[in-house]
C-alpha cells in the first residue's frame, strides 16, 4: 500500500529575477512500513525534499498525497492539524523541552488527543521500553546524554502511531556508538510496528539500516538502491560506491 505519493515536485526560492530551483520535478512513492533514506551532496536538495514531503515547507509545483490526503490542497491550519495527528518528527538537535521530563516530552503528542491517562501511560511505557529509556522517565534533558535525548525524541515521534516519521540527520550530533544504538532501535520499531520512516542522512552507515536509499543530485532523483536480501555490510558497500560516483557526499558540512 502506497502511503506517500509525490508527483513532479518542484521547489523554487527567490523571485522572477533571481529564482533558484532547488527541486526539479521529483517523483517519489513510499510504501507503508518502508524505512527509506534520502542521500545527496550538500546543496542537492535533500533537506528541502524532506521539508516539502512533510509539509513543513510548500511545493512550488506538483502534488503530495499522504494516506490519500492531498497535502498540497490543504490550508496551513489544516496542515498543522494533520502534522500533529499523523506525522512524527526526529530532528538532529532533538527539539526537546528542557522544562519537561523525558516522560513528559514523549507524551506531548498525546496531549491533544482524547486518550485516557491510563492508555497514554501504557503507550509511553511500551515505546520507552522499546527504546531503552524507561528508566530515565523522570530525568530532564540536561541530565541525559545526546544518544538518550535522541531516543527520547524518537519516542515522542512514535508514541501517537503516526502514518510517517520524518527524520532529518537524526544521528548527526551523535558519536558512532550512540548513532548505531539509535539506528538499531529505529530499525526494530520499523519492523515491530510496521512504521514508515523517511530519513535524510549524509552517513552511509546510517543509510545501510534502511531498506531503500534514494540519491538526489542537483534537485533531481539520481538513482536508488534496494537492500533486498543483502546484509547490511554489503548494502553499505553499495551505498559507498554510489556515493563515490555522486562525489562530494562524504564531505558534507
From Swiss-Prot:
Q: Per UniProt, which keywords does this protein have? A: Antibiotic resistance, ATP-binding, Nucleotide-binding, Transport
Mind telling me which residue stretches traverse the membrane in this protein? none
Query: Which Pfam family, an example, fits this chain?
Result: ABC_tran
Query: Which cellular components does GO assign to this protein?
Result: plasma membrane
Record-listed ATP binding positions: 40-47
Q: Which PROSITE patterns match?
A: ABC_TRANSPORTER_2 (PS50893)
Q: Which GO terms describe its molecular function?
A: ATP binding; ATP hydrolysis activity; transmembrane transporter activity
Picking any one GO biological process from the record gives:
transmembrane transport
Q: Ranges for the ABC transporter domain? A: 4-243
The record's section on SUPFAM superfamilies has: P-loop containing nucleoside triphosphate hydrolases (SSF52540)
UniProt induction comment: Expression is induced by bacitracin, via the two-component regulatory system BceS/BceR.
What PANTHER family does this protein's entry cite?
ALPHA-D-RIBOSE 1-METHYLPHOSPHONATE 5-TRIPHOSPHATE SYNTHASE SUBUNIT PHNL, LIPOPROTEIN-RELEASING SYSTEM ATP-BINDING PROTEIN LOLD
Complex formation: The complex is composed of two ATP-binding proteins (BceA) and two transmembrane proteins (BceB).
Please give the family membership noted in the entry: Belongs to the ABC transporter superfamily.
Chain's role: Part of the ABC transporter complex BceAB (TC 3.A.1.123.5) involved in bacitracin export. Responsible for energy coupling to the transport system.
**Name of the protein described by the UniProt record:** Bacitracin export ATP-binding protein BceA
* The species this protein was found in: Bacillus subtilis (strain 168)
Task: Give the organism's phylogenetic lineage.
Answer: Bacteria, Bacillati, Bacillota, Bacilli, Bacillales
